[in-house]
């Protein structure tokens, strides 16, 4: 069984993430969305909230599972018995960091391959950071996130 692990902070999960997850769900038997605790990033939403939002966004995909984690990714991927890391590349600027990360992961988990997918063109400019900034300033984010995520952001930034 081909199991792919798609790690990220997902703060919040966007339609760009959702696009990659849907496509991965067609390519792999089982997709694990690994929501990282990432305390150094000081996330807007708690780990539990980010897991719940990712579950809501992916509930229509029967072969997708959402799991939170706070351990070393190389250990977590083995624990989850995944054989592929999935990473998204929005632009060339993402490649250098992702290439470095893939090589480090190869050292730490040599049996796990890294696979890169680019988002559909209509989502290539979306980032969680931009979504948070637009939401914080009262902008319309409905084109960029699932309605449940838009509601959570509106609640978070209530004035």
UniProtKB/Swiss-Prot annotation:
Any one Gene Ontology cellular component term annotated for this protein: cytoplasm
Catalytic activity: (R)-4'-phosphopantetheine + ATP + H(+) = 3'-dephospho-CoA + diphosphate
Molecular function GO labels: [citrate (pro-3S)-lyase] ligase activity; ATP binding; pantetheine-phosphate adenylyltransferase activity
Localization, UniProt: Cytoplasm
GO biological process, one term: coenzyme A biosynthetic process
CDD domains: PPAT (cd02163)
Site (Transition state stabilizer): 17
Record-listed substrate binding positions: 9, 41, 73, 87
Alphabetical list of Gene3D superfamilies matching this protein: HUPs
HAMAP family: PPAT_bact
Protein name from the UniProt record: Phosphopantetheine adenylyltransferase
Organism encoding this protein: Pseudomonas aeruginosa (strain ATCC 15692 / DSM 22644 / CIP 104116 / JCM 14847 / LMG 12228 / 1C / PRS 101 / PAO1)
């Amino acid at each position: 069984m081909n199991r792919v692990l798609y790690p990220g902070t997902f703060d919040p999960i966007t339609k760009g993430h959702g696009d990659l997850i849907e496509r991965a769900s067609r390519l792999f038997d089982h997709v694990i969305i690994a929501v990282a605790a990432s305390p150094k990033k000081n996330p807007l939403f708690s780990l539990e909230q980010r897991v719940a939002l990712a579950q809501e966004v992916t509930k229509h995909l029967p072969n997708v599972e959402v799991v939170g984690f706070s351990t070393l990714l190389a250990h977590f991927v083995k624990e989850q018995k995944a054989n592929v890391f999935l990473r998204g590349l929005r632009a060339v600027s993402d490649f250098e960091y992702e290439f470095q990360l893939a090589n480090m992961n190869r050292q730490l988990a040599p049996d796990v391959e890294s696979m890169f997918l680019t988002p559909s063109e209509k989502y290539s400019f979306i980032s969680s950071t931009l979504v948070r900034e637009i939401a914080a300033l009262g902008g319309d984010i409905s084109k960029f996130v699932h309605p449940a995520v838009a509601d959570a952001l509106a609640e978070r930034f209530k004035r």
